[in-house]
Design a protein with these regions (language model features):
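Aromatic-Pro/Gly-enriched surface loop or interdomain linker
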Residues: 4-112, 298-305
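Short, flexible/disordered intra-domain loops and linkers
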Residues: 23-28, 59-70, 152-162, 274-288
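Low-complexity, Pro/Thr/Ser/Gly/Ala-rich linker/spacer regions in secreted
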Residues: 2-8, 305-320
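A conserved amphipathic helix/loop scaffold
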Residues: 19, 27, 71-77, 257, ...
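C-terminal outer-membrane/trafficking sorting elements
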Residues: 315-392
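Helical hinge/lid and interdomain linker segments adjacent to catalytic or ligand-binding clefts
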Residues: 64-166, 171
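Active-site-proximal beta-strand/loop segments in catalytic clefts of secreted hydrolases
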Residues: 14-17, 93-97, 118-122, 146-151, ...
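An acidic, glycine-rich "communication" segment
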Residues: 149-256
Length: 392
């Protein structure tokens, strides 16, 4: 799959949480190797770790369908280069960048991106960062969280990735466990073909192929909490696990608000085997699981970049020039446009659960729903637009 169109959808890779610490190099490109990851959770100049800049070099406009993964120097450059080949635009949030949402003073505010990828954070998120991440997802962003095995504390700050993510989920000011996911504290090395049977799932059966195997080389599983978020779903499980249960999950998804989440428990999966010359890296992206990891990660990002209520090709369409009224409303919400066109309207609750999906209309009733916040997706064959609706 290769799209030569000018990319409009932007994917941001995090490098603010010491993702380059120790023998990890979970960055897409670095021109310098001068960072030091410290035991007080800070990252400073004065060491030998990768220092990824905002825009990878050489420029991504030079990437073609045959560009190799070592075109850039980073342990997950293969993933990023494949995303560029698909038509996306990729950036890094550098070590001194800020994780914010709707902060106009930050040129890399999350509102400017469709997907945010965090590959094995080694330092915890602040309270404001947690809120930014949750609000980013709630308002339509896609969040990809890659963890690693318990005890992988690469910067000696007494935090490993499972602890960092669980702290994010369960100690924030917005909602306890918003995505319905928690990481276990395990260290697992094994292969599994226990993939759920769902031919309609675009991650498991997507543009890059069918996922049939996922290998862990020191990873951890997840437990799902559907009482916290009924939209959480396990796609890949441990070999002997019940793949309809909430335990022993290797790859999970969730929907929160009008945004989406993917989570996987092993950072060896996106590792392409080359990067920081001072690290020993292993090819889990292309080689392990007979190429299934590449299929899984690419299909997953495409799903994340597709808004809830939309098909995978809808996201490439422009935003519709429409509005809604009244908002807040106690009964009906109407589409306001300069034409007499009808639209497909999808109404969701705050967890992302679809409440109504109505074709060929310009209004939708919210009369029977309790007061609160809802999300409305308006689309037709020309494009789409998302709205937050308040029921009064």
């Amino acid at each position: 799959v290769f799209l030569s169109t000018n990319a409009q959808i932007k994917i941001l890779f995090d490098a603010t949480k010491a993702e380059m610490a120790g023998n990890a190099d979970w960055v897409i490109d670095a021109d310098e190797f001068n960072l030091r990851t410290n035991s007080n959770s800070t990252v400073t100049i004065g060491g030998r770790e990768s220092n990824p800049q905002r825009f990878p070099t050489p420029d991504q406009s030079n990437i073609t369908s045959t560009t190799p993964e070592n075109f850039w120097t980073g342990g997950i450059s293969g993933w990023a280069i494949d995303l560029v080949k698909h038509g996306y635009f990729v950036e890094t949030l550098p070590y001194d960048g800020r994780i914010t949402y709707n902060d106009s003073t930050n040129p890399q505010d999350l509102s400017n991106y469709k997907v945010f990828i965090i590959c094995e954070p080694n330092s915890p998120f602040s309270s404001t960062e947690k809120s930014a991440l949750i609000n980013f997802v709630s308002n339509g962003g896609g969040l990809f969280m890659v963890a690693n095995h318990s005890g992988a504390d690469r910067n000696a700050d007494n935090w490993d990735a499972p602890q960092i993510y669980n702290d994010f989920f369960n100690n924030n000011s917005i909602k306890t466990n918003p995505f319905g996911i928690n990481f276990n504290y395990e260290n697992i090395t094994s292969k599994t073909a226990n993939v759920i049977n769902d031919s309609n799932n675009v991650i498991l059966n997507g543009p890059y192929g069918k996922v049939s195997q996922v290998d862990y080389y020191n990873g951890t599983t997840m437990v799902l909490d559907k009482s916290a978020n009924p939209n959480t779903k396990g796609l890949v499980y441990e070999s002997n696990a019940d793949n309809t249960s909430s335990n022993n999950v290797r790859f999970a998804t969730s929907i929160y608000g009008i945004g989406k989440v993917c989570a996987v428990g092993d950072s060896s999966i996106p590792d392409d085997g080359t990067g920081d010359p001072g690290d020993t890296l292993y090819d889990g992206y292309f080689f392990n699981a007979v190429g299934n990891h590449r299929i899984l990660l690419l299909n997953a990002v495409i799903w994340l970049a597709t808004s809830s209520g939309l098909a995978t090709d809808d996201i490439m369409k422009p935003e519709l020039s429409v509005n809604i009224y009244p908002n807040p409303s106690s009964d009906y919400v109407y589409v306001q446009s300069k034409t007499s066109e009808k639209y497909h309207l999808t109404l969701m609750d705050s967890s992302g659960k679809v409440l109504q999906s109505i074709p060929n209309t310009d209004k939708i009733s919210i009369t029977s729903y309790p007061k609160g916040i809802y999300y409305l997706v308006i689309k037709n064959d020309k494009g789409f637009k998302n709205f937050k609706v308040e029921k009064k």
